[in-house]
């Protein structure tokens, strides 16, 4: 529902949610001019009176992601769901090098040349990464296509809320309020849809001690504390 996990201590559970509702989606599409002109839900809707879109243009989106198994599974589910609303989807699976290529070199992601794109984002801090969606993080030619905000989302109110949040410390009274403000704006504008959390999985021998996963660190972050067998205290 927002750009941080629901398990995060700063997650705002009061933000609005968007349930899966094809009937409501179809109604909204009809209202804005995307019509099911042939009365066939399996074919893409067509434009009738949509601003800046030629009449009868089919509603077909180009969707880019990597060829990883999990990405393929997610894209197939999303394409099927969008199809229930008369939205066609052309899914293109790219190598990591091609998907994450520099924008100036023709990369669809950092060049922001896509209708839909599925990609991974990660953080090594517990601090909510609101900067992912700030104006200064938009990849452009002027900043050598470096930046996390591949959506191109721009909202001065969000930028200000994020900057304010980053100025606070966890001990400040405004700390929670500041980050919840960014979540409220994000959820209202919804520049991106967080799909799922990637689980961190590891295995250890039964008599290993000191082994503990940290979501913000490498699996062997505390390698000095690891031991096994008789060396482990009861």
Where is each model-derived feature located?
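Long beta-strand-rich cores associated with HINT superfamily self-processing modules
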Residues: 133, 145, 202-234
């Amino acid at each position: 529902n927002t750009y941080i996990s629901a398990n995060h201590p700063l997650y705002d559970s009061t933000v609005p949610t968007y349930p899966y509702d094809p009937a409501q989606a179809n109604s909204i599409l009809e209202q804005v001019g995307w019509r099911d002109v042939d009365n066939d839900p399996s074919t893409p809707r067509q434009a009738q009176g949509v601003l800046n879109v030629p009449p009868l243009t089919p509603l077909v989106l180009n969707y880019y992601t990597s060829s990883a198994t999990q990405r393929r599974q997610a894209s197939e589910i999303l394409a099927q769901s969008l199809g229930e609303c008369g939205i066609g989807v052309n899914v293109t699976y790219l190598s990591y090098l091609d998907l994450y290529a520099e924008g100036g070199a023709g990369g669809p992601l950092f060049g922001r040349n896509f209708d839909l794109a599925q990609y991974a984002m990660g953080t090594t801090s517990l601090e909510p990464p609101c900067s992912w969606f700030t104006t200064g993080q938009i990849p452009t030619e002027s900043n050598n296509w470096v930046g996390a905000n591949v959506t191109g989302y721009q909202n001065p109110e969000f930028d200000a809320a994020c900057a304010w949040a980053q100025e606070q410390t966890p001990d400040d009274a405004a700390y929670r309020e500041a980050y919840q403000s960014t979540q409220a704006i994000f959820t209202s504008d919804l520049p991106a849809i967080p799909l799922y959390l990637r689980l961190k999985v590891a295995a250890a021998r039964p008599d290993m001690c000191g082994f503990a996963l940290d979501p913000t660190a490498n699996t062997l972050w505390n390698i000095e504390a690891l031991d096994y067998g008789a060396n482990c205290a009861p």
